[in-house]
Amino acid sequence: DSHVSRLDLVGKDAIVLKEGKQITEFQDGILPWALQNNIALVFDEYDAGRPDVMFVIQRVLEQSGKLTLLDQKRVIRPHPAFRLFATANTVGLGDTSGLYHGTQQINQGQMDRWNIVTTLNYLAAPVETSIVVAKVKGLDTEAGRKQVANMVKVADMTRQGFIAGDISTVMSPRTVLTWAQNAEIFKNLGFAFRVSFLNKCDEAERSIVAEYYQRVFGEELPESVAVKTRR
């Protein structure tokens, strides 16, 4: 995150106890330590880090991948099996939608040094369904699996609605899992949907999201247009 510092990545002097005496000794940070071992280092939410700090990995991304520690007069050569990965919701372009507040725009010179950039889309519906069922054991029945499959359908409709620009909030697999867990607690699928996802949506868009739910489950929610019209 944005609190990761250069010292965390590169290393710093620390007071250690050796032979009963306190001495100052340099301790490798995350990057030098991982670089020297057969480790896959993953920078999760890479675009949340401060750009000036993330420049530390610039040389590691070069073809040779050597890391120079000038203060220590060391040149660290990467282990043959060392690999560096990163995840970023904005692909380094910065937050233009407001959904990923707190992320940073990554320097394009650094982005250019990543050899492979790929997109990880949502899971296929059967896979997402099986994950939820595996996490919520009470749904591991024929009726439960059918219910979860329909929940995933609602989630997919929010994703398509987001792509089309109809709504500004989207259901992640994590939200579907939370919905299933809350449904187990409250014994009410519609109420669980409202507290798990619908209440997080923009008030002006809730009727659209409630319609997604109605299309799949055939049940009107209090936020539905039809219910509001009857009032």
Model regions: which residues?
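Alpha-helical lid/collar subdomain of P-loop NTPases
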Residues: 124-231
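AAA+ P-loop NTPase catalytic core and its hallmark functional loops
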Residues: 1-149, 153
